[in-house]
Amino acid sequence: MDVVASEQIRALKHRYLRTLDLKRWEEFADTLTADVVASYGSPSGDLPPEFHGREAVAEYMRNALSGNIITVHVATHPEIQVDGDTATGSWLLEDTVMIPDYNRVIRGAAYYHDTYRRENGVWRIATTGYQRIFEAVMGTDALPGFTLTANRWAEPAPH
């Protein structure tokens, strides 16, 4: 077992999710190989089954999560298998998406299945996708007492 490579891949997946949630698109793109293939199908969205290439994936995320949309992605239970300069990984994902403009909260869980490639000593995601366990969409008006008290992406309120 290559413990160093496994830890590097674990850090890579966490960086992928952190840069996604913080909308750091250049850093997000840097977690992906140039020829990455990503599948982000969702029952609540009308998404193409796959995106091909680093720029296509980053552009999709940049557009889909623009404005004041809030996301939190947490990946746990990693199962990483390293074979030289390639690896596979499975992760449990729990995610929350808040869409204030539409008074919606999406909550879900899925299992990610990734492949990784080490190029010039740097691990990147070569393929990524997930299979949903569940996804629930709630209107915030149906949540008694729901108040969004902080949103990093909201326009400042006029004084």
Question: Predicted regions span which residues?
Answer:
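Short, low-complexity N-terminal intrinsically disordered segments enriched in polar/charged residues
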Residues: 1-34
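A beta-strand edge to alpha-helix "cap/lid" segment located at domain peripheries
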Residues: 66-159
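Short, intrinsically disordered low-complexity segments
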Residues: 9-17, 53, 117, 123
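A structural signal for alpha-helical segments
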Residues: 1-4, 45, 52, 104
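Aromatic-acidic/polar surface patches that form glycan- and anion
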Residues: 5, 9, 21, 50, ...
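A solvent-exposed, acidic/Ser-Thr-rich amphipathic alpha-helical stretch
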Residues: 26-93
